[in-house]
Amino acid sequence: MLTYFHPDQSLHHPRTYFSRGRMRMPQEVPERAARLVAAAFAMGFPVREPDDFGIAPIAAVHDTHYLRFLETVHREWKAMPEDWGDEAMSNIFVREPNALRGVLAQAARHLADGSCPVGEHTWRAAYWSAQSALAAAAAVRDGAPAAYALCRPPGHHARVDAAGGFCYLNNAAIAAQALRARHARVAVLDTDMHHGQGIQEIFYARRDVLYVSIHGDPTNFYPAVAGFDDERGAGEGLGYNVNLPMPHGSSEAAFFERVDDALRELRRFAPDALVLSLGFDVYRDDPQSQVAVTTDGFGRLGHLIGALRLPTVIVQEGGYHIESLEANARSFFGGFGALRG
């Protein structure tokens, strides 16, 4: 399977993040990408560096002021006369009212939580992660049956104008929007442990892109503010946003009950192409997991997705149990490839 990854995606190296009242050691680390690249090579996938599609297809999804913020905030942060640290991190979170005067106010608007420090190379890493998604979308748009965007940093929590949940640019949404150039109806299926509230926000009022998410109950669990089953879309998009939350502690069987529900929604929508937001953080030993999916379970998931026989862009999202990433990737792609050739 065609796989896209740029070495600069590994340049983002966060030092810490803030969650639930504590400063914590980062989980979204460069080694995640290294393990997944190794798995791709072991499976015989051609791993290619993406072309540079420029900023325009990213700006088709994200606010241009936000993109400028991501590109410049670290330089402005380091230029402050006081020592504000090596990473831009906000301790103020106010979208509105916000005059956006000064870098601290801009960070208050554009960093939605404490999990997205912006270091010297964060923008470059996020930019090339998005370019990997665009390259995979271009390959599928041009006739490849499937392509893998090995995205890191991940993306599905990134909002139109704000970073959050380890995510800066919404790779899956960028890929889905790019697919719309050829495909009238695009579905995004999200199987990450956490609800992709960024994807939901971007497509919430649209009927040409269906978003279906299987995730842990967001009550007191990231993203906490969205991902509930009564969020169905708005305006023309009413009915085209489907959330399938799982109780914490769910079994693998319960996970696949939600997968069956999601597949029914996809078949009802009858998309021309699919974007899969693939998270390995539903693995039973993942530090973020609240369900019990096994390595073999990822093979079953791949088999079910492959059985749809849709042009498919697979976009990497979470997965933080470093030791299991290669095995889980091999299992998923083995199941997917068993039907796709």
UniProtKB/Swiss-Prot annotation:
Per the Swiss-Prot or TrEMBL record, the active site comprises H157
Q: Which GO terms describe its molecular function?
A: acetylputrescine deacetylase activity; histone deacetylase activity; metal ion binding
Q: How is the cofactor bound?
A: Binds 1 zinc ion per subunit.
Stretches assigned to coiled coil:
none
Biological function: Involved in polyamine metabolism. Catalyzes the deacetylation of various acetylated polyamines such as N-acetylputrescine and N-acetylcadaverine.
Q: Which family does it belong to?
A: Belongs to the histone deacetylase family.
Recorded protein name is Acetylpolyamine amidohydrolase
Q: Which organism is it from?
A: Burkholderia pseudomallei (strain 1710b)
